[in-house]
Regions:
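N-terminal "arm"/small-domain region of PLP-dependent enzymes with the aminotransferase-like
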Residues: 26-92, 224
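Active-site phosphate-binding strand-loop segment of PLP-dependent enzymes
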Residues: 172-228
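Active-site PLP attachment segment
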Residues: 239, 245-280
Length: 414
């Protein structure tokens, strides 16, 4: 069978692109689906920032205290990070011009990976375009088929879930942070050819930490691989080096995924581990092989952000000072902060309507905090999620606490 492509003048003659007849005739399902989302209040309508994503931002012309960003260490505007990006862009250009595998790897990328590996205390690292692409690209390469099993925490991030769905391995989910249940699954599957345990390091909805030390002990007993997504732990735990350093597990975790777009304030994902892991991912991970290379300015900023964390430990200390103070004061006002032990501090509300009312009241007071409702969390576990920043002053925090007290009383939450 042969095909002949129409010339543009032929398409116009037949009313093609000009009149939209080449498009699918019925796209009403999109509108109907969006209307259903809107009716249930689950549609996304992102606020638009008119400034840098800093402790105080401008939204709709109004100065607002930012408590919803991942910019934990406030490095997105750090002079050393910004200048590194500008200098590299001037020298190397705005883009890398190719995928990494063909002609898009620059010395800047390798330098950023070397600095990250040294920082993590591992042999090697490989940078991806995002933490999401690291998970969906690497996980499918670690198992072959039905003879293998993936065992995943029930509250793992959606990018992990998507990565697991791309595999043909057997799948098991264990109750959140329940190492006993994890071991029971390992026992049931001890004859599997490959066993892969996957967990978040810091869980993004509740702000609690995986018992990675216990997970690694069990994994070694059953000869299982350990994969940890530490996107919310890097720059936060273990003097900034993440959950592996926090528990002193260097050399015992097979795959450590991280993100440059959170505490490091830049963009991109990273996988850290052995040199063999890097070579494996570089040759088999489709999301790495088929994604455009990070722009030179981004690679330089990635390297600079890690160097700032190493050279200026006061950022991590200030983050934890703010976190401890803010959580303690919230609880003294009568708010429930759940099981959080990190800079992700939820204010538990129960019903979705309560969380939305609290979020709106805080917005009216000049504070940006997001309502997290079903299906992102259970129906009775709605909350307003706050995320702490090292850049917030004590005066900023007191202003936020006053707004929470006022809003909480007005809606009957405290």
């Amino acid at each position: 069978m042969s095909f002949r492509f129409q010339r543009s003048d032929e398409r116009k003659h037949h009313g093609g692109l000009e009149h939209g007849s080449c498009m699918a005739k019925d796209l009403d399902w999109m509108r109907e689906r969006f209307e259903e989302l809107s009716k249930s209040g689950l549609n996304w309508d992102p606020p638009v920032l008119e400034s840098a994503n800093a402790p105080r931002v401008v939204i709709n012309g109004k100065e607002t205290i930012m408590l919803s960003a991942n910019n934990y260490l406030n490095l997105s505007t750090h002079p050393k990070v910004v200048e590194a990006s500008i200098e590299a862009t001037r020298r190397y250009g705005a883009g890398s011009g190719s995928v990494r595998a063909i002609a898009g790897t620059m010395d800047l990328h390798l330098e950023a990976e070397r600095v990250a590996a040294d920082f993590k205390g591992v042999e090697a690292a490989l940078i991806y375009s995002a933490g999401y692409t690291a998970n969906v690209g690497l996980i499918p390469t670690l198992v072959n088929g039905k003879e293998d099993v993936i065992i995943s925490d029930e509250l793992n991030h959606g990018s992990i879930i998507d990565g697991v769905r791309l595999t043909k391995a057997q799948r098991a989910v264990y109750p959140h942070n329940d190492v006993g249940a994890l071991e029971a699954v390992l026992k049931e599957n001890q004859d599997a050819k490959r066993k892969l345990i996957i967990t978040d390091g810091v869980f993004s909805m509740d702000g609690d930490i995986a018992p990675l030390d216990e997970i690694v002990d069990v994994a070694e007993e059953y000869d299982a691989m350990v994969f940890v997504d530490d996107c919310h732990g890097e720059g936060v735990l273990g003097d900034g080096r993440g959950i592996v350093a926090h528990f002193g597990l260097q050399g015992r975790v097979d795959f450590e995924v991280g993100s440059y777009s959170k505490a490091m304030g830049v963009q991109g994902g990273i996988v850290a581990g052995t040199e063999q892991m890097r070579l494996h991912a570089l040759n088999h991970s489709r999301s790495w092989l088929l994604s455009g290379s990070q722009p030179p300015g981004v690679a330089a900023a990635q390297k600079a952000a890690v160097e700032v964390i190493i050279d200026e430990p006061e950022h991590v200390r200030r983050l934890w000072d703010n976190t401890d103070y803010f959580r303690r004061e919230l609880e003294s006002l009568g708010f429930d902060t759940g099981v959080s032990t990190t800079p992700i501090i939820p204010v538990m509300c129960g019903e979705s309507t309560t969380a939305k009312r609290l979020s709106l009241a805080m917005r009216d007071s000049g504070v940006m905090v997001g309502a997290i409702v079903f299906p992102m969390v259970a129906r009775d576990k709605a909350r307003v999620r706050t995320q702490m920043s090292a850049g917030l002053s004590r005066e900023d925090l007191d202003e936020v606490l006053h707004a929470f007290e006022k809003a909480g009383k007005s809606i009957g939450l405290i």
